[in-house]
Structure formats: structure tokens, C-alpha cells
């Protein structure tokens, strides 16, 4: 393997989400969110009891955002992208089919999903479950469909979900049952020999083609961005890429900086099979699938990410710290320049932790390891089970995210809301406790709730206590604590080396000197030296990545973060 020479050193101060530091803003608590989105994810009707939602699509219609996702038994609507109302749906017989898509056309919302025999439904008032079937004349079998309406009101239909077949597209006539106009065109072929991120496997290591799927089209400044997902929904490296062209049916060219939506690191990974949309203020967002995939390949959640669409640097979603608290703007924001993070650091990672009880293999240490694929489980689901974290010293706590794991449950759809009741208390000495969060009378199904404190709490100890007898185990993927740790900021990362594999140019290996006083590291990369559009969190001092383009030149940098600062100003940039 060939060691790469250092090209240039740069200084950059960054925020959590975007690439520039923002001034402090006053944000109402109900506009502060994190990922995964806190929804009443439905338990599935068969196999091991687990929740699922994936393959989301979202459109703004008559003053509300409507979001549909696979296997959810209904859909959600929101006025602000922060608070969501669930609408159960029984009038769409194909609601259980995978990968839904929706279209705003005139004063009506249209719906369809994956099917060998396409059936389309419409509703002018989707706040009510009153959908009607369209006399559909679209005759091609399809999976992972997507509608796109152009500025001239012409409508196009895209689909594709295969490790062999291409992404397809055709114009349709919505006034004539969505009859196809002309013959479908093959738009995106498989190219895993050139594009490492299309290769399947946890680390893109399997010697076969992945699945190209989940198309979506965005038009920006007269150009058409045809998005697609790869290589498989069960992987953290599941992402969305772009081809771009001047016409809705191509020809399209591959965007070198792909994938544009990508999140292999952090508490929860995955950012694929998504949908890019514009909010009512003109801001772009990407809603996508995130993976757990332990009890079933399709055990998934949804994530929401801000998107930059830059004339110079292309399109890229800001995902790295999108599972830390951030705020939903109520105005137009330049995500390339303005940071929407709350600036709260993770305080709970691998701190001393204890519990009332635990099952073997589900120890309390798994509840603050920043891995959604592992969890703590108490021996029972009885009231009185608890989990406690010692932060090591008194720190300022701003928010706590509770991520329930539903372990040993026997819940299957259809089911009543699964409601947790609990409280969280804090202490400076482990003896005298103050209640910070009271959910003892909670009636909402909120498995990933972010509790933002009205007044920051200065505590060393935090304890969550179950107050409701439940089946199975009281269990948590992670209890995540955010705030200000105080102390020294991280030093500059030293010894950073990037090596490209001589036999497979899609593979890079990175090493650097371990640093003291750090929580983790941020690896950044891109195909343009002045703008590294991708980044991920790494906790060790070495990393192998196989998701690069074979024929592209890349630039890299490495920085560190801790409980005091999430991005340091020293970054070293390397070229290959």
C-alpha cells in the first residue's frame, strides 16, 4: 500500500451540522429535534416483535407536510417538521406494500407503492382517511416507484429495485389513469466495479452487485437530479447518490462526489432510500431510512437531514452529527453557512453505568456505547427497574434522548399504542435527587423521545426509572445525555495517514495517533480540496473504508471532538 504525502494544512472551525459556526439563536424547545425521528413506529405483524418504518417520501400539501413510509399502517402529517400526527389508513388496500410514493397534482394528493400491478389512489383531503382508487392505466410492473412533476405540469414515473436491473423511467399522463407515454427508458445501470459504495456488505466487502433502488427526482436551477439508493437497506453504509441531466428522462451523468446522503457512523447509521424535498421556506431536506437491522433486516427508523444545493459544490446532505440535537428553522436558512445544531455535546459516552438488573448479553454498558445495534435489558418490565449514568463530574445537561429497545416484547400489528411511563432524575452526589423529566402519566408512543430541559441542570448522576409494569424487559438502545462538559478542548490530531489500496482503488485505510481527552474523531473527505462534503464519526484511531470511486481523486482531513467541543480548528488535508 502506498502512503500518501500531506498536501496542505488548513484551519477550519465547524459546527455540528454545517461547515460554519453560527451565532447563538433562541429556539423554542418544540422545534429542537434529533434523529432518528421520534415517531410511533409500528410493530410488524409477523416474525420477531420489532418496529419498522423505511423508504420515506414527504411532500408539502395544503399547509402540511405529509410523510409516508413502508409498513407503517398509515402516514404522518406535520405543520413544522418537528411535531408529527399519525393518521391510520384503511382505505388504501396497498398500504402494506413497500416503498410508497406520493404526488401533489392540482388540489389532490396521489399515492402508490411497489406492485406488479400498479394501483394508484387519490385524496384531496388526506387529513382524513378517505382515499379513492384511480382507474389506473399504468401497465408496467414496478418496485420502489417515484413520481415527479415538472414545472410544465408534465409527470414522470420512475422505479427500480434490483441487483441486476437498471433504474427505469417514463412519462405518464395523470389525466388518463397515469398511462405511460412512450416506452420506459433505462436510466441508471449498476457500476459497483467503479463505485465502491454500490458494493454490498457491512463494509462494502461482498464480491457481488448490490441493490440499486429507491429513485427520486429533484429539479434545481433547470437541472434534474435523479437519486438512487445502494447497496442494501440493512447496512450502515446504505446511502443515496445522484445522477444529473438536463431532461427528466436523461441522459444522466454520474455525480463524482456520490453518495450525497451518507451516514455510516454515529449512534445510528444509514441515510439511503430517501426523498429530497423543499420546505415552505425554501430550505432543502432529505428524509431517509436508518438501520438497526438486528432482530430483522428490515428493523429500521427514519432520519431527517438538511441538504445543501450549491452551484459550486453540488448537492450534499449534512448527516455527521444529525443524531445530536438540532433545530428546525422557521425561516429561510443557508445550510452551507449557518449551523442549525444546538451546540450540545455528548456527555454520556462510555461513562460509568449501572442498573437495577440486567440479562446476560444485555449489560448496562450497552446503553451508552453509541451503537443502536446493542442495548441494555433489565430482567423484567416491572415498575422500579432503573438505569443510572455517572458523568464523572458535575456537568451542564441540556437534553436527554431516551431510545427504548422494546426487548422481549410480544407485540404485533395491529396493536394499541405502546406507551412507556417513567421519570428521569439528576443528582450532584448520588444521594439527593431532583426530578428533571416526568413521564409518569405519558400516553404517547414515543420510543426515541428527546427531552429538552427548560433550564439546564448541573448534575453528575442521571437515573431513568420505569413506573409502569410492561411485558418483556425495560430496555434502552441508549440513554444519551447532551450538554456542556467543560474542560480542555481537543488538541490537533497528529500522525494522520491515508493509504489507497494498490489492488483495489475503491479502498482506503486511515491511521492516526490516538489522542488524549477526546470522545472521537471526524474523518472528512471529498473530491474538491476546498470543500470536503462528506464526514463521519470514528471512535478508534484507525479505519478502513471501501466506498470510494475507483477513478476519482480524494482529499481527506481528520479532527477530534470531546465533551467540550465538537469540532476543533485544526484539520490536516491530504490528497491521493
Task: Describe every region a protein language model picked out.
Residues 369-437, 447-495:
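Aromatic, loop-rich ligand-recognition surfaces of beta-strand-rich domains
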Residues 389, 452-453, 512, 543-547:
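Hydrophobic core positions of the immunoglobulin-like beta-sandwich fold
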Residues 545-566:
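Beta-strand-rich modules
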